[in-house]
Amino acid sequence: MELRAVRGMNDILPEEVERWHKLEGAFRLHAELHGYAEVRTPLLEPTELFRHQMGETTDVVEKEMYSFERHGDHLTVRPEGTAGAARAYVEHAVHAKEPVTRWYYLGPMFRGERPAKGRYRQFYQAGCELFGDPGPLCDAETIDLVAGFLQRIGVGEFVVHVNSLGSAGTRERYREALLAHYTPRKAELSEDSQRRLEKNPLRILDSKDQRDHEVSRDAPSILDLLDDADRAHWDGVRRCLDVLGVNYVVDRSLVRGLDYYTRTLFEVKATAGDLGAQSTLAGGGRYDAMVAGLGGPSVPAIGFAMGMERLLTMMPGASPRRRPGCFLAPLGQSGADQALVLAKQLRALGVPVELDGRGGRLKAMLRRADSLGARLCVILGDAEIERGVLQIKDLVAHVQEEIPLEGAARVLADRALEAPPGGQRGAR
């Protein structure tokens, strides 16, 4: 029986992992430059956490979560990172330790979506969460953080879509306005949207069904219903975005797919590339009621997440696999024994090493060293070991020499780590 990876879940092989390392490293650096520290939360959370915070009528909760019951506990493999971060913030009473908290995370998420280009059932997200700052300046800086990161990794063609959902009173007025708009045309809506109409008509705006798009085309805008405080906040966000020079558009139809958002929300969409319908690179917004909803104090918060697979498709160029600085080619038992010791010494000095322990012919080992892009091939034959020497073949300069076995590790390390002629090989 042939076993394959679960549909929508992919293996990431070594030739691709280097690109992932590059992307993850760039995100860590960028987040830490903005004062964020890494947090790691469990893959499994109580199912109620997501049902309560993301919304019972959202597609994620209704159709896409991987949930199960074990020993009386109802558990879900996390579909996103914000709810878990907020749960950790409350559980560890972080609010009592610092007035403003900035966290970032990277890791896998899981949703039972229909797989498509740039959309998977196991996917990786990088995100930031900021607790404790309610102001529009904070919102604009968060959006600018995302835009700056995309520019850092070479994704230059994108635009930020922004909207405001207001506070609770504004959303209630908007709910009534949407009911008045949709109810006379209920029969034209999809079955899912007809069912959601009374409970949460905002979800209709986020529907992917073309029938709902048609009915929503002339739906009222929440921006027309903002109260004075929400209006001042919204104006402040746009003013700060203008100051920062962020390329953005006001998108009155933007609501995103989760119920916990308040006031500012945003999506970053690619304007070039081959993502098709999956053009959203990042998204987020403010969720000022979540911490209190989890039993904590009233703490404002804002965050975002980015799909890393989509970012990788947009990043220019490919990262080569890390090459060994030294390839050790032992010939005979004494050579093999000495190669084990030498490899350990070189690695302790920071040199990537590959040791060929198959006991093959020298010609085959040289071909292997060359195919790996090694800088040096070190030949350890029994006769050379008996004389206290070893052979070095420089695969860039195409020269071969003999050096004493004693002190060889330091000599090899210096050679392997120096910049080669042309800069084509060697350890990175």
From Swiss-Prot:
In terms of SUPFAM superfamilies, this protein maps to: Class II aaRS ABD-related (SSF52954), Class II aaRS and biotin synthetases (SSF55681)
Picking any one GO biological process from the record gives: histidyl-tRNA aminoacylation
Q: Where are the transmembrane segments?
A: none
Q: Which GO terms describe its cellular component?
A: cytoplasm
Fetch the InterPro entries from UniProt.
aa-tRNA-synth_II, aa-tRNA-synth_II/BPL/LPL, Anticodon-bd, Anticodon-bd_dom_sf, His-tRNA-ligase, HisRS-like_core, HisRS/HisZ, HisRS_anticodon
Record bears the keyword Coiled coil: no
Sorted keywords for this record are: Aminoacyl-tRNA synthetase, ATP-binding, Cytoplasm, Ligase, Nucleotide-binding, Protein biosynthesis
The subcellular location is: Cytoplasm
> Does this UniProt record's set of keywords contain Signal?
no
Entry superkingdom:
Bacteria
Which CDD domains does the UniProt record give? HisRS-like_core, HisRS_anticodon
MF-aspect GO terms? ATP binding; histidine-tRNA ligase activity
**EC number in record:** 6.1.1.21
Query: Where does this chain mainly localize?
Result: cytoplasm
Looking up Pfam families in the UniProt record yields: HGTP_anticodon (PF03129), tRNA-synt_His (PF13393)
Q: Which reaction does it catalyse?
A: tRNA(His) + L-histidine + ATP = L-histidyl-tRNA(His) + AMP + diphosphate + H(+)
How it assembles, according to the record, is: Homodimer.
Sorted alphabetically, which NCBIfam families does this protein's record hold?
hisS (TIGR00442)
Q: Spell out the family assignment given in the record's similarity comment.
A: Belongs to the class-II aminoacyl-tRNA synthetase family.
In Swiss-Prot or TrEMBL terms, this protein is called Histidine--tRNA ligase
- Record organism: Sorangium cellulosum (strain So ce56)
Q: What is the lineage of its organism?
A: Bacteria, Pseudomonadati, Myxococcota, Polyangia, Polyangiales
Gene encoding this chain?
A: hisS
